């Protein structure tokens, strides 16, 4: 894990540019062996928890499907997270999050036939100066 990057970005709130998926904001929080993406989608607060070197289970937001997720830093400022959907529907949602000095880019790809359409594409956000 890149401790320097996690301490710089953990807890920062990013506001997304208007997008068709209706994501409005994004925050990443980290502990030693876990992380959490918190975001607003369709006006609802949502979270995806994941582990580093382990799977963390939860309920996938919007669709209420069980998932198991883990993440890995693939470079100094790029985090890759895969959430395996393990419920009535089976598939996965992939996140590649690139943290800049004052911005974030979130690339998302779903591997499931009928759901999770919001989690396909990319989002660009800027650090929010509002608190």
Regions found by a protein language model. Name each.
Residues 1-131:
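Peripheral terminal and inter-domain segments
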